[in-house]
């Protein structure tokens, strides 16, 4: 049995010893059955939140209104959630009310897909009332109960369906795909932040092209930031070798290259990305547009390492040769990597000339920077001074 489950087992045992039901649930059980890596576990129990808090010495109210208590056991933290049913979903995301219950099957009924509605008890016996194991065997993404109801409860589940297709290389069952097609407009009620998380996970998957093909088939792109009317661009994006991706930022640079938005910053801000990512993508896109077959010394210097490595990564994803090692070596061999590396400063210029500060200081340093970069003069104080026409000290 997986070590992650074994380490968390005492939590289940304490709950059952106290007379309650307790199970591992959700993605950890699914990934165990798929022989995929498991990073953490979720635990569901018939114990109500206050009862959970009485059983364990160290607890935190992380989501107690929805039945979740964080339990600290063996120096690890585990989210323990009470079995529950949910009322109507007024905003296509959150239930209007949550009712705590004692039934595992009723709790599993509210979950999104059958492969995520399998529970495992302390003896590692599986409880699978909705045939999630069969769906896994058939490589099928099938909604629990009526797909239309599950998508109406939380519209993000439609994006999750496409993401799971990419991650697992599964397919949607007929009813789930039909509901996805018919209810796709509900996605407009979902926050961009949640959509962005699913998009990134989708592109990190193993079946990106199939996922984007489905996304376009159901016209999901209409409800994603900056994608309306961009089917051909997304088809091009999907055709690239995304298995060669090593950074998340490459995903966004790839989108900018494919979609060619008139305002890159606005396009990326619509996805709620950090300013640091937006700035890096802007610089990398400009560098990619201006780059020739090989990087010139000046291009490497002005691009800086993060930029040229990102450009190299997207070029590799798009089918060009990987030049990362070559570029890193060339960058390391540059005589300087920024103006701060120059052997002289503005203070030196003022001292040597006796002049007042002014624009001429920056202009002179720019000239020196260029000459050092091109190897015309060494980055050595007296040599620079001689080149400028001043007497040596």
Swiss-Prot record:
Organism for this UniProt entry: Listeria innocua serovar 6a (strain ATCC BAA-680 / CLIP 11262)
Entry EC number(s): 2.7.7.72
Top-rank EC class of the record's enzyme: transferase
Miscellaneous section: A single active site specifically recognizes both ATP and CTP and is responsible for their addition.
Name of the protein described by the UniProt record: CCA-adding enzyme
Catalytic activity: a tRNA precursor + 2 CTP + ATP = a tRNA with a 3' CCA end + 3 diphosphate; a tRNA with a 3' CCA end + 2 CTP + ATP = a tRNA with a 3' CCACCA end + 3 diphosphate
Keywords noted in UniProt: ATP-binding, Magnesium, Metal-binding, Nucleotide-binding, Nucleotidyltransferase, RNA repair, RNA-binding, Transferase, tRNA processing
Keyword Cell wall biogenesis/degradation: no
Residues where CTP binds: 27, 30, 111, 154, 157, 160, 163
HAMAP family: CCA_bact_type3
Protein residues bound to Mg(2+): 40, 42
Membrane-traversing stretches: none
Gene expressing this chain: cca
